[in-house]
Structure formats: structure tokens, C-alpha cells
Amino acid sequence: MPRPGTSGRRPLLLVLLLPLFAAATSAASPSPSPSQVVEVPGVPSRPASVAVCRCCPGQTSRRSRCIRAFCRVRSCQPKKCAGPQRCLNPVPAVPSPSPSVRKRQVSLNWQPLTLQEARALLKRRRPRGPGGRGLLRRRPPQRAPAGKAPVLCPLICHNGGVCVKPDRCLCPPDFAGKFCQLHSSGARPPAPAVPGLTRSVYTMPLANHRDDEHGVASMVSVHVEHPQEASVVVHQVERVSGPWEEADAEAVARAEAAARAEAAAPYTVLAQSAPREDGYSDASGFGYCFRELRGGECASPLPGLRTQEVCCRGAGLAWGVHDCQLCSERLGNSERVSAPDGPCPTGFERVNGSCEDVDECATGGRCQHGECANTRGGYTCVCPDGFLLDSSRSSCISQHVISEAKGPCFRVLRDGGCSLPILRNITKQICCCSRVGKAWGRGCQLCPPFGSEGFREICPAGPGYHYSASDLRYNTRPLGQEPPRVSLSQPRTLPATSRPSAGFLPTHRLEPRPEPRPDPRPGPELPLPSIPAWTGPEIPESGPSSGMCQRNPQVCGPGRCISRPSGYTCACDSGFRLSPQGTRCIDVDECRRVPPPCAPGRCENSPGSFRCVCGPGFRAGPRAAECLDVDECHRVPPPCDLGRCENTPGSFLCVCPAGYQAAPHGASCQDVDECTQSPGLCGRGACKNLPGSFRCVCPAGFRGSACEEDVDECAQEPPPCGPGRCDNTAGSFHCACPAGFRSRGPGAPCQDVDECARSPPPCTYGRCENTEGSFQCVCPMGFQPNTAGSECEDVDECENHLACPGQECVNSPGSFQCRTCPSGHHLHRGRCTDVDECSSGAPPCGPHGHCTNTEGSFRCSCAPGYRAPSGRPGPCADVNECLEGDFCFPHGECLNTDGSFACTCAPGYRPGPRGASCLDVDECSEEDLCQSGICTNTDGSFECICPPGHRAGPDLASCLDVDECRERGPALCGSQRCENSPGSYRCVRDCDPGYHAGPEGTCDDVDECQEYGPEICGAQRCENTPGSYRCTPACDPGYQPTPGGGCQDVDECRNRSFCGAHAVCQNLPGSFQCLCDQGYEGARDGRHCVDVNECETLQGVCGAALCENVEGSFLCVCPNSPEEFDPMTGRCVPPRTSAGTFPGSQPQAPASPVLPARPPPPPLPRRPSTPRQGPVGSGRRECYFDTAAPDACDNILARNVTWQECCCTVGEGWGSGCRIQQCPGTETAEYQSLCPHGRGYLAPSGDLSLRRDVDECQLFRDQVCKSGVCVNTAPGYSCYCSNGYYYHTQRLECIDNDECADEEPACEGGRCVNTVGSYHCTCEPPLVLDGSQRRCVSNESQSLDDNLGVCWQEVGADLVCSHPRLDRQATYTECCCLYGEAWGMDCALCPAQDSDDFEALCNVLRPPAYSPPRPGGFGLPYEYGPDLGPPYQGLPYGPELYPPPALPYDPYPPPPGPFARREAPYGAPRFDMPDFEDDGGPYGESEAPAPPGPGTRWPYRSRDTRRSFPEPEEPPEGGSYAGSLAEPYEELEAEECGILDGCTNGRCVRVPEGFTCRCFDGYRLDMTRMACVDINECDEAEAASPLCVNARCLNTDGSFRCICRPGFAPTHQPHHCAPARPRA
């Protein structure tokens, strides 16, 4: 018995068990009552039938009530308060002394708890602080709502539940679960154990284990009894406190002593292992790494799993899974090294005879972008946020490197856009690091240039290398997350040095009990997890044909195909289950289990597994299948400084004492500044804040506790103002002082003013004497006081005229002096005044000057050309410039004038602009001189330079022509006539009429039609003839006139090489046509044919093989040389041993298993035929195919073919007029005689020694490969179909592949709608499509409309709403898409389910409008449009039966656009559109699908079509395609979309989270305004790769344009200007 007053601690474990098979558990074993007690061996407990109150941590039990323990602030350590004013003394760690004690501490006998019990046990009471205590809940930051925002309830609560929070339903009694979808039975009294149960033992670590407090091993075992058909998942085991948690301190001491005595016992780990579906195999090589050894046990395991070498070279002391192994002596520290001279382990060096650890971090250069942390024998890299360890664990790389986002990779940038994508979507890292792609993604993101910082960020390993997520999965795993799996179906053999290990998950072993009794009560059908020992399902009643596993080993997908006598079955891998049809392994969606895993986090399903995404305040549990609350109160240092920390789910609370409040960051308590919160707290005083309180400091003149009382200083004695008047003021007083007195401010008395101390002082020139209230001035001789008596002023003695007789009197301060007047002055009234010489008598400066009087003299200002005498004032005289300057020289003479001068220039010269020089006259520019010659100016004259045949005239001012014929006489030209010409002459002959003399002396024909114009012949056409002309009828182009006056066609094809080597010229009336050979197309000039690059025009024609263009055709080259490309299946297969390459031929099975090719459809019943010796008659007739079809008469391959050409190729019958003679079988002697060389060869002229390959593509034209591309081979042919089609070997055409009919689900969780060449997926609300557009996922985070209203389920013929939904209100979208036909009190009608509005509102697809199929075929140019017929009823096949499982990229998706115009039958949609995807609809504008035939399914409710399906329209000229994309969404109201401005420059689309704006190209989304704003491409362009080369970038609305710089001109390359070439 424990002693009174002492307390101890023993562990109590709480296990939360969530049975996956709830009904079976409740049926087989009774649920325990809420008062059930967990029995711990060795601990006293009450009987199970007695109700027991268990108090929460921090509370004590008193009289069947739980009382909260209260401790003073700072009186107890954190979590050490045991009761009122009582602290819990710390207890040292208690190691286990013996196996019996160890078992008593960790072993539990347990029964499952009900959901109510689990909630009651985990619920914690949240205390509220009394009085002034502040209470803060720490939450993740959220956007503050504007005004009063109602609570959005996106959950649809079932069974009468009410949505009270965005993530919570308030469920009625007997129901539970997030959506109230689970039926939970009420509390039942305990019942005796039912025989036939199975006991499972789970061994796992404690979730909240702390070594410093608990002092026991962190591994515990839990025993659970459950039915054999139930599977139990233990999410976590926690330690909780209870009223019986008191022990004797002496018992603790004894246990501690016993533990020390047993220290030599072997170390063991309390864990048992058994196979389980989601665990690790023993071959994984990972185990627990233990940091401490306590009492014979390994304790304190590190989070996660490690290999033994990594553990022992680091901080571990022991390692193991089932048994604990001490680290090797050579892997420990320096004390463990025994051999003094032996080599040290890696990471150690010998110092003074011992091995010491090497600090690798001190050398530098390690852990790029991270922090290096030294460990024993090595080092580790700690990466900052946003970075991860790479596979070498020696550097940190950006998280963007392993982004799994995939998109198209473009190889060509052309005309400002992206083109030529590769065939599959890949990650940006693979695209750009391989340097194959130039841009990536739907927005055409340019790959960074090689060597740039952006390139090094996404390609840290350099060009040609990339990181995959699997390389970093071990390094980037969060603590507690599930490690990588090792499939149980593929066991591996451990090396000799490794040890078996188990995953960091609870393992269990099964203990069989007697068989349970059958329970007749039915239960819900829930999926059971697959068991590794399970051998396979039962053989289905009807399955595919036998031999499927040999023909198609991967028919089961993620599983193993097992042949059965009547078919096959599948053994599925872990995480997959057999499909309902029993023919495929499909993924098990663990997230849909009941109850779902990952609570309270979010579960994300993945193929074969799942993962948990935990919210803030939670962390992944040890099993990575749950989210555990983070106890922030256990942090070091603990939060809530100056207060008490209380943990809450996902956060924590700070309870602060009075005068304190929680800090803004919520991690501590801070003092409340009362002075700041209440500014007027102290009135006129100063508030001083104190820890937990405050006080007021009053200024002078105030008093009181809040400084509210004023002090009256005027009532004091003696009066404070002296001779002045005192006026009391608030907080002080004011003195009104008389003249001569002043106060120094409020509260200062009146004092005498010393005027003599002023600056400047009064009484200038005198002495100042201060008096009481005034002053006086004492002045010296010569001064007297002024009238105010404040200054001494000078006495002016010069006012007496007799002071200086005959002289001038000059007064000075205090005196005066007499002086005689200077020159230029005279005495006037006792003063000397100036004499004005300019106004007295004649002008002193003469007629050419201006007189200016000065003091005592004057000054003369002379006109130009005149100057005054120097040294004295006088009249202005003329200046002779000709004597003083070198004017008019050397071509003139200077002449002086009065006030100036003039130049007399020589002939040929004239005065300059200023008249001071003589300049040459340029006669050549002023007169028309030297006609027919060149005028050259000379100094003072000019001269004429005459051309040959000219001479100067008599006046030497012109050039005259020399008449050679007159001067040199008739002998100059002999017998011809001499004709003079300007500058020369010519000898001409006398020509006949209609001819004229040519330049070489010959007679040339005169073209009258050109010389006289078309008027010469009127309405006819003028045709020149030698010496004359004639008028002929006018013929059109391509025709020529006949001798009879008519027009006839010109045969351009007479020249056989007119159309080139790859075409045949066909003459047409008035024209011609070049018919190109296969693989060629007409050039722009129409005169020749050029090669067609099928690798660019036929996207995806080679599948995964490499497409190589050749002249007139193309090749599909397989990456592995032994393989060859099979065009019928689109795959590379081993080479066939047989010589035939005809479609449908069966090659021999290859040695290694490969992906099987598409087998031909099952043979249809053929018409009976009788043996025959040969056809009746010979010659050329019709060749038929598919003769067993009902319309066999229409199945004509070709006409005018021989019996051999038909039957030795692909024909099945030969004849005429539907009188068909069947071709002989290939194994018959008749066939061997007809076709001695086999199919595809003929014996020319009956010579069996020769053979000729038959070109089926040329012989049968487009009938042998309808809607495809036919390529001839030797022998046979290949038919290449576009993506989404396969070649039908009987119908000889490419037909649409119905992906929806394939065994592999095309749309997981949704409805599949097949389209021509592709398919689309649609989901029923509230499910939405994920990023792959092929899978429907839960939309838990979708934000619905705020406006709730009544939903009307029926609308009558008179538009009257009726039958409202009474259980709940709904939004407009919810009502129209799920429940009713009208919404709101105004009875707003919902859109019709076959309308565009309904499609856009509810995110569903509807059947297209039907129209006749457009006949297709590949002519010149190629067209898209396969003929649609009845669907094939056989086994469905797609382009690839199953995609390769290990490829790091996704197959190229089908064209997602609704109106994507297909200009070629293969490849992706056009990339000159703004976006790859748009949500307008599922069909293209080139053709519409045919009406559904037999077997075609439309998963829609039938209603009358109120509106036809809209046909797309071409955007108007000058408009953008983005505008047409937004048209289907323009009718969405702002209230529906939740966006106020309606997504300007974008369109409103529905996304899993609700609605958002999808911006057009050139715009980005501004999240603050939810509007699309223009992207300034010019500002965001990188300097290393400018947008405009040799040009200036100018931003425009939604785009940009380039303006070439001066000296540059635009080129054909977009946004690129080249130096302009100078014009010739």
C-alpha cells in the first residue's frame, strides 16, 4: 500500500481502436460500456460492472467528481501539479528489473472501445481563466472575413445531421462519422466473452513517450480480441493519467536496484512480427535505432528506420527489430577500439593511439544550400525550408526539382508560340534538363538557358541528368511517415551482413480460437483488405477465353494472371483488389474505408496505397496512417512564458494571470500596457506601466490619484506675482505685470526689467542708468536726449550758416569741420555741389559723341568710326581704318570715309558680307554657262570642260557639238549614210518599212503592238510579225489560237518533267494538275511535289518508337535494335520469324514476355463454299474483302485486278457483279499453286523463279487502309492509325477505340463518354475530376455558394413550384445539380439538363447533337474523318492495353479541347491556340459522332432536347481565340461564381475548391481582387534572354510587340530583328 502523502507514477495506456469491419465486431462481441476499466496486470482495478469516473490530466477525483488542480504561478514545474497547492515530486527513471516486472508495465488486456467511449476519453476540458486572465487559441492564419460572413457548410450531412462548421456535422443519436453516415449502436452492458474469437497482439511505440518523465521502455504490446473476419487497425497508443496512478516510492527504489542487478541480461526489443498487407518484409534491411540501454532493454528509438551501419556510425547504441543488437566494436566511439595499431573505421583518424571522430564539416565545401552537422564517423546535411536532401545525401536541392507536375514538352519555338510537343507528358525537369525541350507546360514556359541560374536550380545534376521522386523518398520522409514498401509477393534474399527488420508500424500475431458461431444478422458490405497468404479468387462463371495469360500476361494489370481451365483469374498485388467482373486488379481506395484513415487529416489515395496530409498542429503518426496532435506545451523552451500552457487538438492555449495577456504570436504571455490601452487613464498626468499594473505621475499644479484636482496658487501667501495681478490657470497660474516688469512664464512672478542690459543697449553715445520699472540716458557734449529719452542723438552744428564762412560745413557725430570745394564743384547755400559740363554751352564731345556728366567731370561716348582723345575728355574725331588695318587685301583697295571705309574689288570678286574683304564670285552657280559641258570655277573667273565631240564656243562660255559628218566629209561612212548625233555620229543603213536601224547597224523589226498600243487591233489581240503585225482572236490563259482563228487547249504535260520526279502531270482544259505520289504533297507554286514530313504531321504515329522521316515515307525505329515496330499495335515487338507482315497475321511467340499485340477480332461465320479447281474465266475483275459480312457486295477492294493480285494479297473473293468466288485457303495446294512465293508476292509472266512484291497501297488505294496511312512493305503493308483508333483487319479500316468498353476503367469513380478518337470523364456531384481528368475524387474543400434557399423538387406545367425539400436548404448550384428543378422563394427555374448552362453549372457532360458522319479518308491533303459504323462487339482494346508501369511520365493525353480542329489524323491539337484545355464541350467542329449503335451507352437521363448543341463559330477577324473560349461562361452570374467583377480578361471555371478565374494568355490572376491583370512581358523578361532581339519591347494589353531599332529590319523569326541591308 502506498504511504499517505507520497505519490508515484505508473503507466496507463490509452489505445484508440477503429475496427474496419464494424458490423462484424459488434455482432460477434458486445461493445464495452463507457465505464469499462482497462485492466493492467499487477494494478488493482474495480469490477467491470461498476461505473468509474476517470479524470482528465491536471484534475483530481474527490467524491466522484473531478476537481481541477490549482497551483500558484511558477510554483510547480510544467505538468507537475498534482492538486491544490501541491506539486508532484519528480520520480527517477524506473528500469524493468525482471521479465515479470517488464510484462506488468507494458502488457495490456484490451477490448475494443465504442466511438462514444473513444471520444469521451480523448476529449479534454478547456479551462477559462478567471478575472483578467487572457485565453488565446492558436490557429493557423486565416483570411479575415469582411463584415459578418456566414459559416460555409460544404458538407452534406446524412441521416438528419446538421452542418454546424465547415468540417463538422452535428449528428443525431445512433449515428456518427464525418457525414453522419455510420450507424453507431448505443451503450450496452458488458457481456461475457464469446468463444471463437481471435486474439491479436500489437507491438508499437508510445505516441507521447518522454524518457525524462516516464522512465520506461517506449515499446508496448496490446492484446485485442476480435472475430476472425474482422481486421483491426491500432492508430496510436498514448499514456494518460488516472486516479489509481500512485505508487510507493520505496517500491520504485527497489525496482531500480533490481534493474541494476540485472544489467548483464541480454538486450531485447518487446516486439513480435507477423506478415501483414501494409508492413515490411524481413528483407527490407531497415530496423530501429536505439539511443539508450536501460535495465536490460533498448530504449529511446530514433524516429523512422535505418540500416544497422547508418545507426551504429551515428548516434545509435543498439539496433534491431525482434532482438536488440549492440553496435559493433568497430562502429562505436574511440573507447571501443581495441587494437591500438589497427586501422580506424571510415570517418575516424588515429590521435594519440586512439580513433577520434573526424569533423568533416570543418573542412568546408559540404552540404551545398544546407547546413553541415557532424556525426560520429560521418556527417549529415540539414536542409532549410524549401530544400531536400539529394540521393547522395551530401547536398540540398530545391523542392522544385522533384515536382511531379507533368505537362507537354515542346521542341520548337516558332512565331512566338510553342509547337512540336513530344508524345507524352513529362515533368519540367526531364524536359528542360535533357535539353530536348525548348518550353514546357500549358502556358509555354520557356526552359532556362543552359548555364543560367534558373537552369542550375531545376537541373542541379547538370544537363542530361534528373532526380526522380523515388530517389529522394527515403531522404525526404517526414518523421513518423510510413517507409518504402517491399512487396510481400516478391521476397528478396538478404545479404549475409544484413539483418531482418520490420517497418516502423505495429505488427501483430494471430492466436486462433475456436470457430465462432455463424451470425444470421446481415451487415453492411465493406471491402476487406487483401491477405498476403490468399491464393486468388474463385474462378468466375464466365470469363475471357482460355490462354489469355499466355497471349496477354499483363491482362490483370497490377497483379499476376493465373490460367484456369475455363478462363483465367488474377492474384492482385497489395493495395489492389479484384474487379467485380473478375478480370482486372483495381486499386483499393483506402480513403473510403469506414471510418476513414488519417483523422483528423486528409486522406489522399494513390495506386496501391494512400497517404495522409496533416493540418497545422498535427503530425504524421508512427504508422503514417493517422494524424496526431502536436503537444506544443512540451516544447523546449515551453511556450506561454509568464503563463500556463494548455494543449488543445491542433493548437494550444495560453492562460495568462491578471495584468497579462497572450502575445500576438500566441506563444507567451506579455504584460498588458494599461497606459496604451486607456490613454486617458491618468487624466493630465503621466501613466507609467508596471509589470501587471500601472501608476500615475502627476505634473506640478495637479494632485489626486488620477491627477484630476488643480492647485490654486493665487491663494497662497505671499502673493506669487509681486506687483502684478495673479490669474489662476489649470495646473499653474499667470502673472499680469505692469510696464517695466515682466514674468518669465506661467507660474513665474513679476520682476523689474533691466533695460540697460538689452542688446543692443539703449542710450547710444551716452550712458544708461536703470530705474525701478524704467531707465534714463546721460548724454556727453555734442549729443542730446531724444524726445522719448531712450537715445542720445547728435547735435547738427552745420544748421548754423555762420559756422564756416566761404567754406562747406561738414557735420560729424558730436562735432563738425569746414573744407574748400574741389574742382568741378561750386559753393551753393553753404554746400559744395557738382557742375554739369554737358548742359553748359557748346557740346563738349562734338557732333559725333554723346556727353555724360560725372561727379566733378564728364565722359564722351563716340559713334562707330570715331574716338575721343586719350587721357582727357574731349570731342570725338574720325578714325582712318585703312591705316590701322589690312582691309580689302589682296583682291581690292581700301578707301577711307567719314566714320567708316569701303573696298573697291577687282573683276571676278565682290565685297564680302561685312565689307572688309573681297571674295571670289562663283560664276558657275549664278549663270547658265558651259551648256553640254562642265563649268569649273576658278579664282576670279571660270572655265568650261567640254565632253568628247564638243568644243568651246567663241565666248568660251558654252560647249558646241562638233558635226563630224560635215567636217570630215562623206568618206567618214563610206557607202553608208552618216548621221550626226550630239557628241558623235553614226553610220546607218536604209531599212525596209516595218524595220528600223539597230544599235549595231542592223535592221531590227518594229514591234507595232508595243509601239502603238492595244488600240491598233481594237477588240482583237495584236500579235507582232516580222516587219508587220496581225490581229487575232483573244484566247483565255491555257489556250492558244489556231490558224483558223479559234482557240485550242495548251497541253502543258507534253513535257514529261513538267511536274518533277515525284508526280504525274494531268492535263486539264485550260490548265493542268500535278498528282503527287504517296508521301508527297503539292508545293505552293503547284509545279512540283515536296516530301511530307510524316513525323511532324502524324503526331504519335510511331507510339513510343522514334519516328525518322525519309524521302516519300517515314520509318519507326525502335530504341532496342533487336526489336521491330508493329504498326497494328503501335509497339516495338521482337522480330517475327515468319515473313508475313500483313495485319492480323499471327507471329510466333517471342522468347521473352512482351506486351501482347492487339489480336484480330474473332472470326465471323463465313459463307459455305465448295472446293473448286480455279476461277471460271480469267482476266481482270473485282476483288472483295470481308465476304462474310451482310454487305459483302459493297466490300470491293479494287476493280480490274487479276485473280493472283486479289487472292495473293488481302482479298477474300474475286469476281464481278457480286458473283464472288472465294479465294483458296493458305494451306491448300490451290493456294500454293496460285501464290508460290506466299502472300504479298507475284510471279511475273508465270516465271516461278522470279517474284515481285505487290504494292497493296498502290493497288487498292484508300480501300485497304481506310482512315489511315498505308505504307507498303516487302511483303505486305502497314496501316498507321491515329491515336484513339485501331486497325480492323477484316474491315480494313481504322475504327474508333471505345475506351469506355475496355476492361481497365477509363474513368475511375465516374462515367465514361466515348468520343471519336478519344473519351471524356464526368463525375456526379459532389465528386470532381482531379488533375488527370480521368479520376473522380472527393471535393471536401469545395466552397459552395453563400446564399441558401428552399429547393423545389417539381415545377408544374403552369410554372408553379411544388414539393419543396424540407430537410434542409440548399444553394442554387446544389439544388439544380442534385435535388430539384427550381430554387428560392421567387421560384427561379434551373437550367435544362441538356443545356449549356447546366453543363457549365454542374460540371457534367451531355450527349452531343447527332449529325450524319462525314466521309473521311487520307487524300491530298490529309483529312480527318473516319467512317463510323456499328461498334465492334468483341474484346475491347485501346492503343495500349496497359501502359508501362515504370515510365516516369504519363502517356500523351487525348485532345481535351471541345472544338480542336484536327488538321492531321495524328498527334496533339493545334498549339497556336491560347490553351490546351477548354471546358466548352467534348466534340470537334470537323465532324459529329454517329448516333449510338448497338452496345453504345449514354449514361444520361432522357429529356426532351430544349436546345441544340451549339456549333462553334470562328472568332471574328481581329478577335482572339480566348474570347471565344469564354463565351460559354459569360452567363455565369457573379453571385454564382463568388467573384464580384466576373473574371475580367478571363473566365469563371469550376474547380475542386469552388470557383476561380482562369485567365487568358497574357494575363495573370490577382488574388487580392480576383481579377485577371495584364502581364508586362517586357518587364518580366530575363536580361540573359530578352524577348526582343535588336528591338525594343512594347507591352500591349494581353501581349507585347517588338519595334526594331534604327538600322535593323524584321526577319521571318518572330521577335527578332537583323541588320538592314543597304539598298543597291
From Swiss-Prot:
Family matches, as SMART domains: EGF (SM00181), EGF_CA (SM00179)
SUPFAM superfamilies assigned: EGF/Laminin (SSF57196), Growth factor receptor domain (SSF57184), TB module/8-cys domain (SSF57581)
Post-translational modification: Contains hydroxylated asparagine residues.
Signal peptide span: 1-27
Main location: secreted
InterPro entries, per the entry: ECM_structural_protein, EGF-like_Ca-bd_dom, EGF-like_CS, EGF-like_dom, EGF-type_Asp/Asn_hydroxyl_site, EGF_Ca-bd_CS, Growth_fac_rcpt_cys_sf, NOTCH1_EGF-like
Top-level lineage group: Eukaryota
Basic and acidic residues bias locations: 508-522, 1501-1510
Entry similarity comment: Belongs to the LTBP family.
Function text: Key regulator of transforming growth factor beta (TGFB1, TGFB2 and TGFB3) that controls TGF-beta activation by maintaining it in a latent state during storage in extracellular space. Associates specifically via disulfide bonds with the Latency-associated peptide (LAP), which is the regulatory chain of TGF-beta, and regulates integrin-dependent activation of TGF-beta.
This protein's name: Latent-transforming growth factor beta-binding protein 4
The species this protein was found in: Homo sapiens
